[in-house]
Regions:
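Long, His/Glu/Asp-enriched segments that create or flank divalent metal/ion-associated functional microenvironments
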Residues: 115
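Domain-core detector
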Residues: 1-112, 125-174
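Catalytic core of tubulin tyrosine ligase-like
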Residues: 119
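An acidic, gly/pro-interrupted, aromatic-rich
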Residues: 122
């Protein structure tokens, strides 16, 4: 009975394993993988539709939304207007979103608009639109990002303990 209970506890902790292993060597649970894929796919689909419509009207500039606690790859570009074209002439008012100046790693999983990035690209027409995004202090942003990361770790621990409690109660070991 003890071996069975240990096995059930172990399975409950690990969840349903996927074969996905990230660059850090962490194996993702199926639940985490599905949640991440659905969130990213929905955001990317909406973003692509918006940008397709923008290109129909020859609009290439976007206002990048800003929020406290943004990842490092997003911290410099957020709250600024950027040009979506890969290369723009040096006399253009707005830098390309791909410009190394931003350090945004745009188009990569861990970069700006990558996995779990919540930034939006709002169509921006120079001379018509205004930048209404709040400017965020880089040091404060980094501090909040670290605190948010720690909060997520604590939330995962709470979920783990609740799973243990549910399994124990189901096995009548409260």
């Amino acid at each position: 009975d003890e071996a069975l209970e240990r096995t059930i506890q172990s399975w409950a902790q690990k969840g349903i394993k996927s074969t996905f292993v990230d660059k850090g060597g962490h194996t993702w649970s199926l639940e985490r993988y599905v949640r991440t894929v659905l969130k990213s796919t929905l955001g990317n689909t909406y973003d692509k539709l918006r940008k397709d419509r923008m290109s129909e009207y020859d609009v290439h500039t976007v206002l990048v939304t800003s929020h406290m606690g943004a990842r490092k790859a997003c911290s410099k570009i957020q709250g600024h207007v950027a040009d979506l074209r890969e290369s723009v002439s040096s006399n253009e008012k707005y830098k390309s979103i791909y410009d190394p100046y931003w350090g945004a790693e745009y188009g990569t999983a861990g970069g700006h608009r990558g996995i779990n990035c919540n930034h939006l690209h709002i169509p921006f027409i120079p001379g018509i639109n205004t930048n209404n995004q709040p400017k965020i202090d880089a040091k404060e942003n980094e501090k909040v990002a670290e605190l948010t990361k720690r909060q997520r770790q604590l939330e995962r621990q709470v979920v783990k303990f609740k799973k243990n409690q549910m399994v124990s109660e189901a096995l009548d070991h409260t």
